[in-house]
A protein has these predicted regions:
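Conserved beta-strand termini and adjacent loop/short-helix elements that scaffold enzyme active sites
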Residues: 158, 233-235, 267, 362, ...
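Active-site glycine-centered loops adjacent to acidic/histidine catalytic or metal-binding residues
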Residues: 211, 235, 335
């Protein structure tokens, strides 16, 4: 399979020399132009001149999302506004949105990184790429768009939503590549079958999927449904956007990090110490080439591991595992830590079910109670004669309940749902509905 840039096969020494030069430049740029970093470094008595090796990165403090929000909207910029050519922002559901900005060089670098990612996924010049990521302040749509054009693909900027139109254009334009969230691609496939279209009969050969955690079992379902190769793309707007890391279609064994643009670390989120290679922890990124908004040791909140072993595809870049989940998405049920993706994998293993589900959390007395709503397949629903009290349904619920109890150590109340009853997503799927945090009125004490 083609390799987009010779940097992807650099030796360790070549990459480390490049990274150290970029780290020194980034620290100096941030120190001189961003008051937040200047004050933070000053408080711990560090200047840019103190950074003389890659190991010195660990002397620098972490950056967190709240730092960006506290400096809303433009106090984290390291360049004048007349050098900024684009502004993106993440959702502000828990406060002000997180604003990120790009210079012309930033946009060019980003396009190059994403072109590299599309190549990793199996794309090449002349392909038609169907981009069903959302366009707008979200970085997904425009990030994939720029990379697709840089590579020389014919880009279909359909964005998310309007599933019927998605299907029409896939049928008519015959794209080789599709980009979307994994849950939305399943939605498209399901809608195709309802129209009598076999998803495996389309022109699609490769899918670039991301923006939400998804299990290996869901990958199997997608690849089986569409008869294509599904690869995982990673990114977040605070660091750059999509393309920070990308799985190669050849091996599907870890996501290749763009080491020439970012330094990745894995830390224990409690002790903040680096963990050994191969161990899971929180993913941390430092940018090396960004001009408008350089970021230093940004704590992503994503749980993953990394390896520096050479991939069988020939690339020597650091690889990260697929994201296991987010620290803030991790469910704590009666003291047990569970990621939604762990529950998803056992749903996908059952042929009677489809991977459309929601996890409902509530309090019953003082105890956490978990209810899993999961849809059955249409053919199984017919076998049940549309009756969830049917012995086959009861057996399925008992089997899944025992598996979840054994594998996740939590008790789950399972409710089977009829086909197409759980709301579909045109972007990131809403998997967890947590009603445990409702405010309880205080009572006066006499």
């Amino acid at each position: 399979m083609a390799i987009y840039s010779e940097r992807e096969t650099w030796s360790t020494a070549q990459m480390h020399d490049h990274q150290l030069e970029g780290l020194k430049r980034t620290v100096r740029h941030a120190y001189q132009n961003i008051p937040f970093y200047h004050e933070t470094f000053k408080n711990i008595h560090i200047t840019p001149g103190d950074i003389q090796s890659l190991e010195d990165l660990q002397r620098l403090p972490f950056t967190k999302k709240h730092h960006l929000r506290e400096n809303y909207p433009f106090k984290m910029l390291a360049c004048p506004m007349d050098e900024v050519v684009r502004i993106h922002a993440s959702s502000g559901t828990s406060g002000k949105p997180t604003v990120v900005a790009y210079t012309k060089n930033d946009i060019q670098n980003w396009a190059d990184i994403v072109a590299r990612s599309i190549t990793l996924a199996g794309g090449q010049k002349g392909d038609i790429l169907h981009n069903a990521y959302g366009y707008g302040l979200f970085t997904g749509g425009l990030g994939l768009h720029a990379g697709s054009e840089r590579l020389g693909c014919a880009t279909v900027p359909i964005s998310g939503g309007n599933t019927a139109n998605q299907i029409t254009l896939i049928q008519d334009f015959k794209p080789r590549i599709i980009c979307s969230t994994p849950s939305y691609l399943l939605n498209i496939g399901e809608a195709m079958m309802m129209q009598g279209i076999d998803p495996a009969s389309t022109s699609l050969q490769y899918a670039i999927l991301g923006a939400e955690p998804w299990s290996e079992e869901m990958r199997f379902q997608i690849e089986k449904l569409f008869h294509l190769k599904a690869t995982d793309i990673y990114g977040l707007s605070e660091v750059m956007g999509p393309g920070i890391a990308m799985e190669c279609a050849e091996c599907q064994n870890g996501l290749h990090i763009a080491d020439d643009h970012f330094i990745a670390e894995i830390i224990n989120p409690d002790t903040l110490d680096q963990v050994d290679e191969g161990q899971y922890g929180e993913l941390v990124f430092t940018s090396l080439t960004k001009e408008a908004l350089p970021i230093i040791r940004y704590r992503t909140g994503d749980i993953a591991s990394i390896t520096r072993e050479k991939c069988l595809c020939g690339r020597t870049t650091t690889r990260m595992s697929r994201v296991k989940g987010r620290i803030d998405d991790m469910l704590i049920i009666r003291g047990v830590n569970v990621f939604p993706s762990e529950i998803e994998r056992y749903i996908c293993n059952l042929e009677e079910l489809v991977p459309h589900y929601q996890i409902h959390l509530q309090k019953k007395g003082h105890l956490d109670h978990v209810t899993l709503h999961v849809e059955v397949k249409q053919e199984f629903y017919k076998k049940l004669e549309m009756n969830f009290n049917h012995p086959m349904a009861v057996k399925l619920v008992e089997s899944l309940g025992k598996t979840l109890k054994m594998k996740t150590l939590i008790s789950v109340d399972i409710q089977l749902k009829e086909p197409h009853s759980i709301p579909r997503s045109e972007g990131k799927a809403k998997r967890v509905l947590d009603a445990r945090t409702k405010i309880i009125p205080k009572t006066s004490i006499h």
